[in-house]
Amino acid sequence: MKFVLLFGVLLVTLFSYSSAEMLDDFDQADEDELLSLIEKEEARKDCIPKHYECTSNKHGCCRGHLFKYKCQCTTVVTQSGEETERCFCGTPPHHKAAELVVGFGKKIFG
């Protein structure tokens, strides 16, 4: 009888210890995931939205539905006759085509 009682107490102790460690691991994973999401959100706030100027920061465009927007540049002639480069964040044609195909695929297959 003493052996069964001792074995039961040992089993309950081991079970509570292992479940506490698993909960600590889950809590740590949740904290890491939360920090990762916060960092991504901060990066998203600093990015340049679609159709906005990105001349000074060509790699700072935000993400679109599937792809990150690309900084597209054109040469503009000012009224004084100077040529300057102006850039904006936009979706390249091959990304537009891929998004169109994915959209049709979602409509067909559900």
From Swiss-Prot:
Keyword Disulfide bond: yes
Subcellular location: Secreted
Protein name, UniProt field: U1-lycotoxin-Ls1hh
Domain notes: The presence of a 'disulfide through disulfide knot' structurally defines this protein as a knottin.
Organism listed in the record: Lycosa singoriensis (Wolf spider)
Recorded family membership: Belongs to the neurotoxin 19 (CSTX) family. 03 subfamily.
Disulfide-linked positions: C47-C62, C54-C71, C61-C89, C73-C87
Position of the signal peptide: 1-20
Main localization, broad class: secreted
GO cellular component: extracellular region
Keywords recorded for this protein, A-Z: Disulfide bond, Knottin, Secreted, Signal, Toxin
An example molecular function term from Gene Ontology annotations: toxin activity
Tissue: Expressed by the venom gland.
Propeptide section residues: 21-44
